[in-house]
Amino acid sequence: TFKLKKGELLTVLGPSGCGKTTLLNITAGFLRPTSGKITLGGNEINGPGVERGMVFQQGALFEWLTVAQNVNFGLRMKKVDQKTTEKKVEEWLEIVGLKGFGNTPTYQLSGGMQQRVALARCLINDPELILMDEPLGALDALTREKMQSLVLKIWKETGKTIILIT
C-alpha cells in the first residue's frame, strides 16, 4: 500500500521481474489488481483514462508520422482546434528541446530524441498523473543524464505527479 500526493515524484527501483512494470500497468488501468484496489483522486481505476499519461521504455511512436503529428495525436483525437493544437505542439517541442523538428519523421531521430517526443506527446494532453516505464533504459549514459534532468525540470515547473520506474 502506498499513497502518492499530488505533485510528488515517486521513483520505483528494483531488479528485473519484481513487479515494477506490473505496478505501473495496474496504475495505468492496463491490468487489474489480483486483490485490493487502486484509486486516483478518490476514483477507482478500472481501465485506461485520460487523467493518466504513459511514457513507455521504447518511444512507442507512430514512425510514419512526423514529430508534430506524433505529439498532437491525442489532441487530434479529442478534436481540439488546429490553431490551439499547433500552438501547444510548438510549446512542448521547445520545452523538450526539439524546436524546429516538427516536420521530421520520427524514424530519423535518435533514441533520446524519440523519448523526448514521447514525453511531449504525453504532456501535451495535460494528464493528472504521468507514468514512466523505464524511459531511460535504452539510452546511452549522456543522453540518460540529459533526459533525467529534463524530467526533473518538467516535474518542478509543472507540479505534475509522476511515477517513474527504473
Place the predicted regions along the sequence by residue:
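Conserved ABC ATPase "signature" region
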Residues: N72, R76, K83-F101, L152-K153
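Short coil-to-helix segment of the ABC ATPase nucleotide-binding domain corresponding to the Q-loop/switch region
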Residues: L65-N72
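The feature captures the beta-strand-to-loop junction immediately N-terminal to the Walker
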Residues: L13-P15
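Catalytic Walker B motif of ABC-type/P-loop ATPase nucleotide-binding domains
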Residues: I130-D133
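Conserved ABC transporter NBD signature motif
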Residues: G36-G47
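Helix-to-loop junction immediately C-terminal to a conserved catalytic motif
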Residues: A28
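Conserved signature/switch motifs of ABC ATPase nucleotide-binding domains
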Residues: T104-Y107, N125
